[in-house]
A protein has these predicted regions:
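Carbohydrate-recognition beta-sandwich/jelly-roll modules
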Residues: 17-295, 327, 334-335, 472-473, ...
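Autoprocessing Asn-cyclization modules and mimics
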Residues: 341-428
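Aromatic-lined carbohydrate-binding/catalytic grooves of carbohydrate-active enzymes
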Residues: 256-364, 441-459, 463, 469-486, ...
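Glycine-rich, aromatic-flanked loop segments that form ligand/cofactor-binding clefts
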Residues: 236-255, 288-296, 320-363, 432-433, ...
Length: 792
């Protein structure tokens, strides 16, 4: 504890704690009398307790506060006593529960209700308003954001703290799981710590009475639960959290000496591709064209659990991965890999041939008879464990795994039918009636889960392979699977912190879920998007929704994954216009992204190097903050289109584009004697030259297409066959290409035909194959005057 500037004093009515910009006064009944940040009063006297205890389904508040031997002693309504140690530093005030009655189920720090909510950082635990910020930070993984599940209704009803959930692309986070809840008249901070020392039956994944094993070690007890409170000006909130991390020993990842939450490199874009040791040189070549500093493999493992490497990735295990990583490092590129955290494949050695006793169990089933080693109908006592459909339908008895096909109820028993004995390569055996039969948790990915003890071994293996190989990026996908243990946000935080503490170098990382404590570890969040839509329509609203989530939680911004594809039955090959739409969104939101390009696409896309160069140019300008705030506002609008052109090393031109709808000409629907063609109405804000993308579909071909406007005629002496394109650019060059834009022939246009601004007409004509009648689809692109962007 520091000297007099931050020392605690006590009067007859209250205890006061101080830190820079923050003064906290606690009344003699154990309730907050005042919380002031820069002299702004943020609480109403007597509404927020220092601690609420959760005991046997009831809430117990404090009724008396005393200072004894430099600790705060709270006498609760049930006459039990909780002691809290405290500290005051320039950065924060900490409160740690040092003695909590063993019979308590959990404690809440507060809840603390405040009267500001201009910006509510619901996950990070920072509320801003009237120019100031108040924050609460958990100091360890046992102290979690939100309310224990069994006490949600009591707490929300009693303290009137129901508010907004956190909405993001992967789903919403309910208000009772948040660090700070946005309320109609302010906000509420919610932090808790539960007693994890005993085996319990809890609700897990919508199932009641699931088996939850006790936690071993110091994390099991409520003693040690700890928070930090801080106050500052709103613009200093992020900086203050960084200082608290360093001071209090929280995770504080650095990128080249700079904190990850402020480093520009935290929002760097990266390449996702299915490279291997056999083609990594080619992938590195392409990565350097795009300026990517990270390449990331989406599926390098043969199994999840032991995390053995797939032979299609490398053939020499960890040593071969290290050689690959070293090769990339010599070219300034880091390598990352994808995991599904604690998801466990059924080919892993923790499952087969002898399953680990630490596979995660839902609960125990009671056999009604002995079973032999081939019996495929098994009778058990009736249970509620089958209320939620599973995927693998796996059970464990002794050293055998069994799967069932269906469940039939008969009176007070259930019959498991179509059982597969010795499932997943285990050995079928006979078992006595009293042998424990366990129903296992699984996931729709056809995976199982470990309990916490086995989960730790998964992390040990991941830290081992990262330390040994030098890998520098990981995605903790499926991190929510850790919560299947019944240990809420503690379980994923344990996974992430153990990995962070165990790896000897900084690892850029993201995850499928962001929680309060893992905020300190994760570099950023970056979710994959479904590939069932075109790039510019794939979850646009969700991508934008995520930006608001990142901003209010003081977190590096990412736009998600984008896919560059080859042509298939449903989609055309990705275009430069599609890509630059995504890149302009990235520039507008100042958010990184992942570009998913398979090695096959890298090789077969005819414009790949141009696309990669565009990525490099846009990212260079974004990373150096070369776009003005006014330009960024326009760029982030998803209805706008843009093209960036490099003029010199330090000068770029940014063109606004107008891209028309698709115009169609069905050559099979012409009247007798009518020449092939169509008349189209076009509307564009930009006059002058245009580019276009013409595609021929259906049987046959066209020849000599031409376009006529009120300003002239332009013709293209060429033949375009089924599935081919005629591409015409603003540079005056035209090419016939295949479906993936590989050039088949270059074409010299004849004439010129500019368009006028506003509404006008374009006439299309062509010669066609007399024996067939293909369809022609055309999309026109016009552009406005460029804005000059200087790279510095």
């Amino acid at each position: 504890m520091l000297g007099s500037a931050y020392s605690m004093y006590i009067s007859a009515q209250e205890v006061t704690l101080k830190s820079t910009d923050l003064t906290v006064s606690i009344a003699e009944n154990g309730f907050y009398r005042s919380i002031q940040v820069q002299n702004e009063e943020l609480v109403e006297t007597g509404h927020s307790p220092l601690i609420t205890a959760c005991v046997k389904g009831t809430l117990v508040q404090p009724e008396k506060l005393e200072l004894k031997k430099n600790v705060l002693q709270l006498t609760m309504q049930d006459k039990n006593v909780i002691t809290l140690s405290y500290s005051e530093t320039p950065n924060c005030i900490t409160l740690e529960a040092t003695k909590v009655p063993a019979g308590y189920d959990a404690i809440l720090f507060g809840p603390v209700k405040v009267n500001i909510n201009e910006v509510v950082g619901d996950v990070v635990g920072v509320v801003q308003g009237r120019g100031v910020a108040l924050g609460v930070q958990a100091m360890n993984i046992k102290t979690i954001a939100g309310i224990p599940d069994e006490y949600i209704k009591q707490v929300k009803d009693f303290y009137q703290c129901s508010g907004k959930s956190a909405e993001l692309s992967v789903g919403s986070i309910p208000d009772y799981k948040l660090a700070a809840v946005d309320l109609p008249d302010g906000a509420a901070f919610l932090f808790s710590c539960r007693n994890r020392s005993r085996a319990e039956k809890r609700q897990v994944q919508q199932l009641q009475n699931m088996e939850v094993l006790p936690v071993k070690g110091a994390d099991a007890a409520i003693n040690g639960a700890k928070i930090a409170l801080f106050g500052c000006s709103a613009e200093q909130a992020l900086e203050r959290i960084g200082a608290i991390e360093v001071e209090q020993g929280l995770p504080h990842p650095l990128f080249d000496g700079e904190w990850g939450k402020t480093a520009r490199s935290a929002m760097c874009s990266y390449l996702i591709t299915d490279f291997s040791e056999k083609n990594v040189d080619y992938v590195l070549d392409k990565s350097q064209i795009a300026g990517f500093k990270y390449i990331y493999h989406p599926g390098p493992f043969e199994d999840w659990g032991h995390f053995n490497w797939s032979k299609s990735f490398v053939e020499g295990g960890d040593d071969a991965v290290k050689a690959l990583v070293d090769k990339a490092s010599q070219r300034g590129i880091s390598v990352g890999v994808h995991t599904l955290s604690n998801f466990t494949t059924t080919n892993d050695a923790y499952v087969t041939p002898v399953p680990s006793e630490h596979l995660l169990k839902q609960g125990r089933l009671e056999l009604l008879m002995d079973i032999n080693n081939s019996q495929n109908e098994i009778s058990i006592k009736k249970t509620g464990l089958f209320a939620l459909p599973m995927t693998l339908n796996a059970m464990m008895i002794d050293q055998e795994l069994i799967t069932y096909g269906e469940v039939k109820e008969e009176d007070d028993k259930m019959i498991l039918k179509n059982c597969k004995r010795g499932a997943f390569g285990t050995v079928a055996a006979s078992h006595g009636k009293k042998s424990p039969l366990y129903k296992l948790w699984d996931y729709p990915y056809k995976t199982l889960f470990p309990d916490l003890e086995l989960q730790d071994k998964y992390v040990d293996r991941l830290t081992e392979l990262f330390n040994k190989t030098g890998l520098k990026q990981i995605s903790f996908d499926g991190l929510e699977g850790c919560s299947y243990t019944g240990q809420d946000d503690y379980a994923p935080a344990r996974f992430v912190e153990q990995f962070y503490r165990g790896v000897g170098h900084n690892v850029l990382n993201d995850a499928s879920r962001l929680s309060h404590f893992t905020w300190h570890v994760h570099t950023r969040m970056n979710w994959g998007e479904p590939w069932g839509e075109a790039m510019r329509t794939g979850q646009v609203e969700n991508r934008i929704k995520n930006q608001n989530y990142f901003k209010r939680n003081l977190f590096p911004r990412m736009l998600g994954w984008f896919l560059i594809r080859l042509a298939d039955k449903k989609f055309e090959c990705s275009t430069m216009e599609d890509l630059e739409w995504a890149l302009s969104e990235s520039a507008g939101f100042d958010a990184g992204y992942a570009m998913n390009i398979s090695v096959n696409t890298l090789k077969k896309h005819g414009q790949m190097d141009q696309l990669l160069t565009a990525i490099r140019n846009w990212d260079m300008l974004r990373e150096k903050k070369c776009f003005t705030s006014e330009q960024m506002e326009r760029l982030k609008d998803p209805s706008t289109e843009w093209h960036l052109e490099k003029e010199s090393e330090n000068l770029f031109s940014l063109y606004p584009l107008s891209i028309t709808k698709h115009y169609h000409c069905s050559l099979g629907e012409l009247q007798p004697g009518q020449p092939g063609g169509a008349d189209w109405s076009i509307s564009t804000p930009y006059a002058g030259k245009y580019a276009f993308r013409l595609k021929v579909e259906g049987e046959g071909y066209i020849e000599n297409p031409k376009f006529v406007t009120e300003k002239g005629t332009i013709a293209f002496p060429c033949k375009v066959e089924e599935g081919q394109y005629l591409l015409y650019g603003f540079d005056g060059k035209a090419h016939v290409t295949d479906k993936n834009y590989n050039i088949i022939a270059s074409v010299v246009p004849q004439g010129d035909a500019e368009v006028a601004a506003g509404d006008s007409h374009i006439a299309f004509a062509c010669d066609k194959d007399e024996e067939s009648a293909p369809d022609v689809t055309v999309r026109f692109i016009t552009r406005g005057a460029p804005e000059k962007i200087h790279y510095q």
